Amino acid sequence: MILEHADITIAPGQNAAFEAAIQRGIATVIAQAKGFRDAKVHRGIESTERYILTIHWDTLENHTVDFRGGPLFPQWRAIVGPFFAKPPVVEHFELAAGHG
């Protein structure tokens, strides 16, 4: 299983609208994607326009090829993209250690 970590900065004053949009986008678009497991969105405390979106995928290719290269990605970006103050920084991680 792969963890996608997206660091998102939105325009000031758009928190409520962005949070509604990202929830809708996850539920209606990303949840349909091949290999999707779960997603969480965290809002920054010190920087309230900053969000961390984490998504678990079965494989890296489920995100980078199937989702990003398929018809769902433009739908996703149409929902959340207008809120971005700058392009998100996206990285992928694999579990190295765990407890619980």
Which residues make up each language-model segment?
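Short, flexible segments with low predicted structural confidence
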Residues: M1-I2, F18, K34-F36
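Short, well-ordered beta-strand segments in beta-rich or mixed alpha/beta enzyme
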Residues: I2-T9, D38-R68, F93-E94
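Short, surface-exposed ligand-recognition loops at beta-strand->loop->(often short) alpha-helix junctions
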Residues: T9-I22
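Feature targets compositionally biased, intrinsically disordered low-complexity regions
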Residues: P12, R24, K34, R43, ...
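Intrinsically disordered, low-complexity segments enriched in polar/charged residues with Gly/Pro
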Residues: Q14-A16, A27-I30, V41-G44
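Residue-level signal for secondary-structure boundary sites
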Residues: A16, E61-H63, G98-G100
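An amphipathic, aromatic/His-enriched active-site/gating alpha helix that lines ligand/cofactor pockets
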Residues: R24, T28-F36, H56-V89
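Glycine-rich beta-strand-turn "strand-cap" elements at beta-sheet edges
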Residues: K40-I52, Q75-G100
